[in-house]
Swiss-Prot record:
UniProtKB keywords: Ribonucleoprotein, Ribosomal protein, RNA-binding, rRNA-binding
GO molecular function: rRNA binding; structural constituent of ribosome
Family: Belongs to the universal ribosomal protein uL6 family.
One Gene Ontology term, aspect cellular component: cytosolic large ribosomal subunit
UniProt subunit comment: Part of the 50S ribosomal subunit.
Protein name: Large ribosomal subunit protein uL6
Matching InterPro entries: Ribosomal_uL6-like (IPR000702), Ribosomal_uL6-like_a/b-dom_sf (IPR036789), Ribosomal_uL6_a/b-dom (IPR020040), Ribosomal_uL6_arc (IPR019907), Ribosomal_uL6_CS2 (IPR002359)
UniProt-listed Pfam families: Ribosomal_L6
Length: 204
């Protein structure tokens, strides 16, 4: 049985709004907000590159679309609520960026003696790192949401791009984790795959 959803409205909020954040909706973006019977908000952001949907639920926090803005409001005023409002605002801004520009992480394959070979199976949603540290069994990293997250290998450079920042970031983290070397001195054994750039910001 399908769960009922309804469009949230400011007038239906039980209490007085004491704090709010707003996100300007871009011209080429459509944002839909619905609320389930359990009060969880479902936010769908659609743009030229696709659409992303996320759920939000925090007590005393309310979301709705007002004209060309998303309003994120709270009926309590404290540091925690302020942080939650800021976090949701950042999520929605990242969702807008994803469906208009996309998100991109860059990684570097580092090795000293054994040149690994990185193979991407986009359909299967896996990345295979063969001959890593001379190992016979390939190491495997999962591509999160492979239909919308792409992994590209260009020599020792690896690019992860997609519309969902969380999926892109987690895929990059999976690649790092897959080549983690246990019980070895990292000052000596620096082989691995490392994130070097996140959405244009270099990692020192």
């Amino acid at each position: 049985m399908a769960e009922a959803k309804f469009e949230p409205a400011k007038d239906a909020i039980p209490g007085v709004i004491v704090m709010e954040e707003r996100v300007k909706i871009k011209d080429d973006v459509e944002i839909e907000i619905s609320q389930r019977e359990d009060r969880r908000y479902e936010v769908t952001v659609k743009g030229p590159k696709g659409e992303v949907t996320k759920e939000f639920y925090y007590p005393d926090v309310y979301l709705w679309v007002e004209d060309d803005e998303v309003v994120i409001a709270a009926t309590r005023s404290n540091r925690r609520q302020k942080a939650i409002l800021g976090m949701i605002k950042a999520y929605i801004e990242n969702m807008q960026k994803g469906v208009t520009e996309g998100h991109e992480y860059k990684l570097k394959l580092v090795y000293s003696h054994f040149p690994p070979e990185v193979k991407v199976d986009q359909k299967e949603g896996k990345v295979y790192i063969e001959n890593f540290m001379g190992e016979n069994v390939p190491r495997v990293a999962e591509i999160v949401d492979p239909e919308n997250t792409e992994v590209i290998v260009q020599g020792q450079d690896i690019i992860v791009r997609g519309i969902d920042k969380e999926a892109v970031g987690q895929t990059a983290a999976n690649l790092e984790q897959a080549t983690y070397i246990k019980d070895r001195d990292p000052r000596v054994f620096q082989d691995g795959i490392y994130i070097v750039e996140k959405d244009g910001k270099k990692i020192v």
